Amino acid sequence: MIALVDCNNFYASCERVFRPHLENKPVAVLSNNDGCVIARSNESKALGLKMGEPIFKKRELVRRHNIHLFSSNFALYGDISKRVFDIVSKNIPAYEIYSIDEAFLDFRGIKDPYAFAVHLRRKVKQWTGIPISIGISYTKTLSKVAGYLAKKSPEGVCYLQDKKHISDILGRLPVDEIWGVGMRYAIKLKKYGIHTAKNLLECDETWIRKMMNVVGLRMVRELKCIPHFSLEEGRSMKKSICTSRSFSVEISDYTRMSEYISMFASRCSEKLRGEAACARSISVFMYTNRFKPKARQYSGYFSMDFHTAASDTITITKLAIECLKKIYRSGYSYKKAGVTLSGIIPRNQVQLSLFDSADRKKADTLMQTLDKINGNMGRDILKLSSSGINNKWKIGKERLSPCYTTRWSDILSVRV
């Protein structure tokens, strides 16, 4: 049996941990620069606040219902995530951390999976303050279905074992709620009269493969209780790493934009080294403010490959600037830009290229020194000059909560 652990409304729940008075009150977390909604409590969802919605469009709703807004605090969320999964992975033969708020657990050998899940859920809530849902079934895809139902259950746990019951559930499950069926596939399937998971199971497998490729076919077989996706033990390797920002003040100067792109590339490099990984390609994108239809509109994107998969800041930043030069156009005011690293592989799997003249050992030593100094003394104590000497590069976060668990100055004091 496979279990899916899913932290409920994770970012919003993290903000509530240290503010218990917000329990049962509407809470929402905003993206960088406090631009869009990226997490909502159930109360905020009930009020009609939607994911990805620009918050300036909902000022009246926020005021009328006193929705509590928070700037995203990823240092806090990442630390609480680690605490949650340290607890759930104990006494489990294998587990896979799928995302910051989800993990798959191997429940083989557990005599009473439902009772174990109920106990685990209570333990996580008691030890961290984070509510979780647990879905249990034969495969990863079915555990996702069980997790979807667990969120609607008062107990927060759903165990799908009886195959007739599973068939009944799939007959009511909307096709767009299946793991791996995004909006594009859902629209396409509905055109063929496929509205539920059971409708999809009744289709010919050759047709499914043609419509949804081999991954889609495996997903459908998993709905039939046939395992196809094994656990990738520990923490899954990210497929891509992106750093991007919506600018509070639009950028219309190349030098300023190149400083931001340089800093984005540096951030991506740090994250990459934190994963003990290297990237094979890089892309840069930028675009104007689409919410100003009367302004001149432009969007640019360019991608390049490294000769050899890289993780050092200097190599990555150089190529990021090359990409920027390909797409930058004068005369526009840019609202958002970003850098994405893709083709990510473990550092120990990198194959050297004949065309690579860089001294890899020297670069690795330099990056280790840079990371150590910045880790001990504070971020950007050492940085590339291309990111701006006097550029403080501060993200607009007017509603940022303290880093209660990762910064000594923010630790709560208790009076006894």
Regions found by a protein language model. Give the residues of each.
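Short, charged/polar surface micro-motifs in flexible loops or helix N-caps
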Residues: F10, N33-C36, N289-K292, I344-N348
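Short Gly/Ser/Thr- and Asp/Glu-enriched loop/turn motifs at secondary-structure junctions
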Residues: Y98-E102, S137-K140, A277-S281, Y332-K336
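Short loop/turn motifs enriched for small/polar and acidic residues
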Residues: S137-T139, Y287, T340-I344, S387
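DNA-contacting surface of Y-family translesion DNA polymerases
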Residues: E177, I187-S333, Q349, R415
